Amino acid sequence: MENVEARYVDLDKLRNIGIMAHIDAGKTTTTERILYYTGRKHFLGDVDEGNTTTDWMPQEKERGITIQSAATTCFWKGYRINIIDTPGHVDFTAEVERALRVLDGAIAVFDATAGVEPQSETVWRQADKYNVPRIAFMNKMDKVGADFYMAVETLVTKLKANPIPVQMPIGSEKDFQGVIDLIKMKAIYWVSEDGSVYEERDIPEELREEAEMRREEMLEKVAELDEEILEKYLEGEEISEEEIKRILRKATIENRAVPVLCGAAKANKGIQPLLDAVIDYLPSPLDLPPVKGWRVSDGEIVYRKPDENEPFTALVFKVQVDPYIGKLVYFRVYSGRLEKGSYVYNSTKGQRERISRIVFMHADKREEVDYVRPGDIAAGVGLKVSQTGDTLCDEKEPVILEKIDFPEPVISLAIEPATKADEEKLVKALLALSEEDPTLQVRVDKETGETIISGMGELHLEIVVDRLKREFGVNVRVGQPQVAYRETIKRPAEAEGKYIRQTGGRGQYGHVILRIEPIPEEEGKNFEFIDKTVGGVIPKEFMPAIEAGIKEAMMSGPLAGYPVVRVRAVVLDGSYHEVDSSEMAFKIAASMAFKEAMKKAQPVLLEPIMKLEITTPEEYMGNIISDLNSRRAKIESLETRGHLKIVVAKIPLSETFGYATVLRSLSQGRASYIMQFSHYQEVPEKIAEKIIKVV
């Protein structure tokens, strides 16, 4: 175990990285091996055995997929590396989004037999959104069908990246033995069974020619990144190892290049050079621009540098409920210093909190520390109100960092306790789970009294139900999955709402004239409120009540009671009574006017459309496509990847329930698919009639 002081390395020796990948590219195994070789693990975890460190929730151990991003810290050659494990399954994109917000760099892991797969495209685009510098690791080089250069080429064709291989594999499939370092021009072989002993040797004669050609290709790409080096290169001068690394590092941090390495994590080959590459090419907190925030007092933009003397600023990126110490709030420190036992200000909530303990996490073990500094990723105990996306800062100089956006849920399930004893436990458990996961929404249906949970996909909700049983001991019954339909309007309409009550004593008086109009989808807004009244016909202090009345009415549309979206509400006119007018009266009048206007505005039903990507052997493609056509799907593209076909389609969510079973029988279990939300679109009239009838 390192001594405490070693933990606080200089900032330039700190790396905050994520490991991102398609669901089966071997990300968890890669993380495991990193922890093993950096000395934090004493046995080799194997996902198939279910004893890995970062996959520590029982569901993950069973399913072999990573759901919760656990933050882990380890050391390599005097550098400290904080790793945030991100899930590769599409139902968990919220976890990926929040992990990417707080990372400085990432390792993108690919399966060398497939290269870029559909989910890796999604994660890559999310990383682009946050400008995260990346290096790529072509894993599974020992698998049948592994082809390093084909896999590298997919980075260009599918991701428009600029990959620069800095290694070349020695053999592939069962003959994969090691790698050639094209910068040092040395061959690296792994000698011991567990891969902890490796040695550099001269490049074997039979590979020398190819290695020189590959080095030349690398140098050419490196030279294109820097004017000075380009001149040297064109004049045939020697370019040193240091220069190559310096240029590659700069270009990686600026997102102009992606160094590519290869290996086979499960066979314990290729991990140590990957760790060296994390240090060589990925940024420390000092290499990145200061974090941007908004001053609470006046909304001015301020920047916080990664410096202990700056005011404290941190972003909460995860909340977990730990069975032993309660609520753990994970945060990334951008500036300043925070001691345990001190007060911190949550500027998002406008509340002051005391952080009683600070812990560094090693997957599911934890070590307590006295303070945190810039660049640290830690978890705090004692923060009651803090949630994902909140800013924690110095009370004297409060700022707000930009919030993390999460997508709206698209699928719902009714859920009820199996017995009376489960009733109270269910409420508590759902509260804890929705606090951890911002894409899980919980509500009670006013009419039926049922508890409804909503999320990002079937798997997402299955796992929630599973966790209720295992972690919280709550037995539940669940209904059929329901689509989260929405309602909107196709044309503007006006209406008036008048609420007048005259009973003994003070009456009630509210009067509102409204226009509602559709908001085009591309504006990306679900609601906008505009006050166009003039001459004080309605005093300004009633406007918030009018807006609240409209929002309440929007929760249940006129067609089938689904939430209303993409509507702009404009208050045109109205009147008030000096004595009888109240917020309550205006809220009711606005709600009446809105409901009336909705009826005239040609309301329509919207349904979630999913992007579906199916990977299948060619012989099943005909059956799969004709089945898709029967499900109202639109085929967008057909691609060939090796001996497999990739079908990309847009399909209504309502047509996909139980699709896993259907696809299994259509392809004898050989096809796989991933699905994610794309957009909302109008439901065809005949189908809308059926949905409305059921309601």
From Swiss-Prot:
Its main location: cytoplasm. It holds the Pfam family EF-G_D2. Signal peptide: none annotated. Keywords: Cytoplasm, Elongation factor, GTP-binding, Nucleotide-binding, Protein biosynthesis. GTP binds at residues 21-28, 85-89, 139-142. Catalyzes the GTP-dependent ribosomal translocation step during translation elongation. During this step, the ribosome changes from the pre-translocational (PRE) to the post-translocational (POST) state as the newly formed A-site-bound peptidyl-tRNA and P-site-bound deacylated tRNA move to the P and E sites, respectively. Catalyzes the coordinated movement of the two tRNA molecules, the mRNA and conformational changes in the ribosome. This is Elongation factor G. It comes from Thermotoga sp. (strain RQ2). The gene is fusA.
